[in-house]
Amino acid sequence: MQIQEIIKGKKGKLTIRLEEGLSFPIYEKEAAKYRMTEGGFLSDQDWNEICTEILEKRAKRRALYILQRMERTEYQLRKKLQENGYPEEIVQCAIDYVKSFHYVDDYRYACTYIRYHQ
């Protein structure tokens, strides 16, 4: 996978855009570990490691943080995670994770919403 662009963000955060159209957030230290440079290549092995060791864990923590303050629908949570720059497969993994603990339940959300807005 070729790295098309590296966009600097706040607090040492980068957004890496790949030629395939994927983009993902990563910190400068992690990018240096994988020797990411514009125009450089990212091996499939490195990509799989980044997904499992960095992005999945971070997206799960982010989902829990988002749900900590108020209940949300699956759609709302998906939208928030996508706004944070996570790829769709990572977003789905994080949603499946929080659903496994019943932290996201659209039926319960709808019942609660109706109960409080009658």
Spans of features found by a protein language model:
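An alpha-helical, amphipathic repeat domain used for nucleic-acid recognition
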Residues: 1-118
